[in-house]
């Protein structure tokens, strides 16, 4: 059996996910630029919603790409 995934944000005691922290957000985006689901990352529902909002804000401000074509 596999080990249960734990939410990193809960362990670290993060109150709110910052959209300007691009390096942390990149860990939750796959190669094609999609947001990785919580069942894969183990993120709790509360932080998954915050994460999605932060990623969308960062995309809007051009801190993160919308799709994989921008990685080249």
UniProtKB/Swiss-Prot annotation:
GO terms for biological process: translation. Pfam families: Ribosomal_S18. GO terms for molecular function: small ribosomal subunit rRNA binding; structural constituent of ribosome. GO terms for cellular component: cytosolic small ribosomal subunit. Gene3D superfamilies: Ribosomal protein S18 (4.10.640.10). InterPro entries: Ribosomal_bS18, Ribosomal_bS18_CS, Ribosomal_bS18_sf. The keyword S-adenosyl-L-methionine does not apply. PROSITE patterns: RIBOSOMAL_S18. Keywords: Ribonucleoprotein, Ribosomal protein, RNA-binding, rRNA-binding. Part of the 30S ribosomal subunit. Forms a tight heterodimer with protein bS6. Belongs to the bacterial ribosomal protein bS18 family. Binds as a heterodimer with protein bS6 to the central domain of the 16S rRNA, where it helps stabilize the platform of the 30S subunit. NCBIfam families: S18. This is Small ribosomal subunit protein bS18. It comes from Francisella tularensis subsp. holarctica (strain LVS).
């Amino acid at each position: 059996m596999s080990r249960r995934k734990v939410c990193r944000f809960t362990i670290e005691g993060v109150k709110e996910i910052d959209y300007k922290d691009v390096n942390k957000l990149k860990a939750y985006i796959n190669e094609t630029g999609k947001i990785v689901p919580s069942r894969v990352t183990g993120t709790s529902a509360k932080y998954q919603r915050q994460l999605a909002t932060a990623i969308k804000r960062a995309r809007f401000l051009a801190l993160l790409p919308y799709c994989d074509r921008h990685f080249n």
